[in-house]
Curated annotation (Swiss-Prot):
Organism from which the protein derives: Mus musculus
Gene: Selenoh
Any Pfam family hit: Rdx
Record-listed N6-acetyllysine modification sites: K20
Family: Belongs to the SelWTH family.
Protein name: Selenoprotein H
Alphabetized UniProt keyword annotations: Acetylation, Redox-active center, Selenocysteine
Function: May be involved in a redox-related process.
Amino acid sequence: MAPHGRKRKAGAAPMETVDKREKLAEGATVVIEHCTSURVYGRHAAALSQALQLEAPELPVQVNPSKPRRGSFEVTLLRSDNSRVELWTGIKKGPPRKLKFPEPQEVVEELKKYLS
């Protein structure tokens, strides 16, 4: 058996300055609910999640935290005071199915309105 090495102490993490956006986003979460019956919903949810992470990396994004509704595609901002802001809903949209999905930039712009 190989000898065990010593653990090194972790260096102190540098304190980062918290800008206005991070303070507003503290405790907020973006939830994307999409139907799992078809892969198209999952692809659009992944693309939207990636766009939101690029725009606001400090904001956590959850995809389907609970069982989604059939035919649903919704994006919701959950604030720290337990209020919900609907950024996009495609439940009553369609057919055609492509009307259910937003352009990622539309949702990012809507999110910016609520974070500023």
